[in-house]
A protein has these predicted regions:
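N-terminal helix-turn-helix DNA-binding core of bacterial DNA-binding proteins
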Residues: 1-46
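DNA major-groove recognition helix of helix-turn-helix
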Residues: 49
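Glycine-centered, phosphate/nucleic-acid-interacting loop/turn motifs that mediate DNA/RNA or nucleotide
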Residues: 56
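Short beta-strand "wing" residues that participate in macromolecule-binding interfaces
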Residues: 60
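Short, solvent-exposed loop/turn elements at beta->coil junctions and helix N-caps
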Residues: 63-64
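Basic, amphipathic "hinge/linker" alpha-helix immediately C-terminal to the N-terminal HTH DNA-binding motif
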Residues: 67-88
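Amphipathic alpha-helical dimerization/coiled-coil segments
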Residues: 81-111
Length: 111
């Protein structure tokens, strides 16, 4: 499924709300939460993670993974939590606006 601009950032922030994860786990969590509807390409995920890090919304630290491998683990910052709240509000507004367009007006007949 294709993403609207900025949607991936919101999904990453939301996923990290529940705790720190490495990139592969972030992609898996989004895929699992969406019941396999959203498959995040790593070519999109890692630039998004870098962008979020540069904005100060997440921080990254190299750690040892559960499989005893080095992995960059990402954590949500307080600024990231605030940004997530803003993004969730914008998303809700967007969904309501699309729903209004998609719902026929009273008396409107589709061709």
């Amino acid at each position: 499924m294709d993403f609207l601009q900025g949607t991936l950032d919101m999904l990453v922030l939301r996923t990290l709300l529940f705790g720190p994860l490495h990139g592969y786990a972030i992609a898996g969590a989004i895929r699992n939460s969406s019941r396999e509807a959203l498959n995040i390409e790593f070519g999109s995920l890692y630039p998004a993670l870098k962008r979020l890090e540069l904005k100060g919304w997440i921080v990254a630290k190299w750690e040892t993974s559960e499989h005893n491998r080095r992995a960059k683990v990402y954590r949500l910052t307080p600024a990231g939590r605030r940004q997530l709240r803003k993004e969730q509000s914008r998303w809700a507004d967007f969904v309501r606006a699309v729903a209004r367009v998609m719902k026929p007006a009273p008396g409107e007949v589709e061709p």
